[in-house]
C-alpha cells in the first residue's frame, strides 16, 4: 500500500491560524503536527493553556513569545528542540516540565518568565542557550542533568530568587555571566570536570558564602566572583594556572581565607602581575597547613 505524503499544512502550525480564539483559550494542537512555526502564537494574550501532541518535534523561534496570560504548557515525549525565545516573556507561566526527548533549549527560550518558579529539565538535554532562563525572578532551584555539556552565557542571569544549583558533572565551562546577579544563590554543586569559570560567572551573588573549586579547575575569569559580598572562603585546587585578573574577587568584603592546594611558588607565579582587591587586611592565602602570605 502506497504511503500518502502529507502537505506542509498538515505538519506545521503557522502564524495566524488560531487568531480567532476567545479569551482564556485552551488550545489543543492536533496529533500529526510536527512543528510550530516561528511567531505562530506570538503576542496572543488571550491564550491561557496549550496542549502539544506527541507528534511534535520542534517549537520554533518566538512561537509563544509574549503570551502574557499563558499559565500552562503541556509538552509530550517526542519533542526534540525548543528554539530561541520560544516562550520568552510568558509572564504568567509558573512551571514547565520539559520531556526527556528534548536535546536543545535555545537562546532566551524562557527569558523574562517572571512567574516561573519550577523547571524540570530534560534528562537528555545537551545544550542550554544563552539567556535561556535569565530574568526568571521566581525560579528557586535548578538541576542541570549530566547529559548537558554546554550552558551558554547569561543562561540564569538575574534569577533573583535562585538559591541552589546542581550543575552537570560533564560541564567543563561555566560561561560568562551564567549566574550573574543571582543575589539569593547560596549553594552551587560544581561540575567534577570543570576547567574554567568564565568572566562574571557569579558576579553579584551576594548570598554565596563558600566555594570549593573541584580538582582540574585551571582558569578563573575576570570578575568571576566580584561583589560576592558574603563570600568568606574559597578553596582553589593545585591545578589552577591562571586568574585572569584578581578583580575576580573584587568587592568580596567578607573574604578572609583563600586556600590553595599547590605550592607557594606556583601561587606566586599565578599572582605575578595581579593585584588583590579584597578589602579585608587579614585575608590570607594558605597552602596545606601553611599560611605563607598576608595579602593587604
Whereabouts are the PLM-identified features?
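Structural signature of tandem-repeat unit edges
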Residues: 1-12, 21-35, 45-58, 68-81, ...
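Consensus positions within tandem repeat domains that build extended binding/scaffold surfaces
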Residues: 16-17, 37-40, 60-63, 83-86, ...
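Short, glycine/charged-enriched secondary-structure capping and boundary segments
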Residues: 42, 65, 273-275
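Short, aromatic/basic amphipathic alpha-helical patches
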Residues: 247, 268-282
Amino acid at each position: 500500500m502506497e504511503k500518502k505524503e502529507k502537505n506542509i499544512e498538515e505538519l506545521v502550525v503557522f502564524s495566524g491560524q488560531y487568531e480567532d480564539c476567545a479569551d482564556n483559550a485552551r488550545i489543543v494542537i492536533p496529533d500529526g503536527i510536527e512543528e510550530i512555526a516561528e511567531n505562530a502564537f506570538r503576542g496572543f494574550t488571550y491564550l491561557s493553556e496549550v496542549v502539544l501532541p506527541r507528534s511534535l518535534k520542534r517549537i520554533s523561534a518566538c512561537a509563544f513569545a509574549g503570551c502574557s496570560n499563558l499559565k500552562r504548557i503541556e509538552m509530550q515525549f517526542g519533542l526534540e528542540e525548543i528554539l530561541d525565545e520560544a516562550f520568552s516573556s510568558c509572564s504568567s507561566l509558573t512551571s514547565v516540565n520539559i520531556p526527556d526527548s528534548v536535546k536543545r533549549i535555545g537562546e532566551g527560550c524562557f527569558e523574562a518568565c517572571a512567574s516561573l518558579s519550577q523547571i524540570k529539565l530534560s534528562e537528555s538535554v545537551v545544550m542550554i542557550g544563552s539567556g535561556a532562563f535569565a530574568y526568571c525572578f521566581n525560579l528557586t532551584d535548578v538541576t542541570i542533568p549530566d547529559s548537558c555539556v554546554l550552558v551558554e552565557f547569561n543562561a540564569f542571569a538575574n534569577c533573583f530568587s535562585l538559591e541552589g544549583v546542581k550543575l552537570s558533572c560533564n560541564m567543563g565551562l561555566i560561561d560568562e555571566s551564567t549566574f550573574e546577579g543571582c543575589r539569593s544563590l547560596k549553594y552551587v554543586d560544581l561540575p567534577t570536570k570543570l576547567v574554567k569559570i568564565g568572566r562574571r560567572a557569579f558576579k553579584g551573588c551576594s548570598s554565596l558564602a563558600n566555594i570549593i573549586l573541584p580538582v582540574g579547575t585551571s582558569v578563573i575569569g575576570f570578575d568571576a566572583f566580584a561583589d560576592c559580598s558574603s563570600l568568606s572562603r574559597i578553596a582553589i585546587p593545585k591545578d589552577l594556572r591562571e586568574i585572569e585578573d584578581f578583580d575576580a574577587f573584587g568587592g568580596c568584603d567578607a573574604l578572609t581565607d583563600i586556600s590553595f592546594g599547590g605550592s607557594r611558588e606556583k601561587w606566586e607565579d599565578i599572582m605575578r602581575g595581579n593585584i588583590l582587591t579584597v578589602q579585608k587586611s587579614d585575608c590570607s592565602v594558605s597552602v596545606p597547613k601553611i599560611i605563607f602570605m598576608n595579602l593587604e
